[in-house]
Amino acid sequence: MTLNLDDFQKQDIKFDIAKLQQAYKEIVKTQKFEDAGVTNFGAISLTQIPGDPESIKGSKARGVFWTKPDQSGKEVSRDIDINEEAYSEFIKDYENTYFKEVYDKLSSKYKLGRVRILLKQPRSTLSWHRDPEPRLHIPIITNPGCIMVIDKVAQHMPADGSVWI
């Protein structure tokens, strides 16, 4: 088997990791992670559907994904469909953080939907799943044992301000 790292696409854009980490620390002082009823999962939404604060709560913090829950190997849909394009309003509580600058720069280059800070507890994993569209990832806090797996390739994405698809 030949390993193919093409699924890990480092983008030609980078942010100040110290500023990202400081903005994260500021937000978690006042905001609780929405767990959507899932163990070891947490999200703080930075965007919402304009004028709709309910659009970032419960299952809407996660949105639809596909998984293979049993030995049949068949994919099944989980959670609720989300109209990613509708999440176009940056939440006012976070406008004075570095995340707003990051959002503005990414918005000028990519078509964004929901933008979230995601939390994975130490020694926890997400089960295998497939998202409905490509996702941008910017690791903010991580360690060398933290890896992303795409197909059969595992890779560590360092917290250095890089943006990955």
Question: Positions of the model-derived regions?
Answer:
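A structural signal for short, well-ordered beta-strand segments and their strand-loop junctions
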Residues: 37, 114-117, 137, 148-149
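Non-heme Fe(II)/2-oxoglutarate
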Residues: 1-102
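Tight coil/turn sites that cap or link beta-strands
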Residues: 121-123, 160-161
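Short, conserved beta-strand element in jelly-roll/cupin
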Residues: 119, 130-146
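A short beta-strand-loop-beta hairpin characteristic of the jelly-roll/cupin
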Residues: 139-160
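A short glycine-rich, His/Asp/Glu-containing loop-to-beta-strand
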Residues: 101-122
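Contiguous ligand/interfacial binding patches
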Residues: 163-165
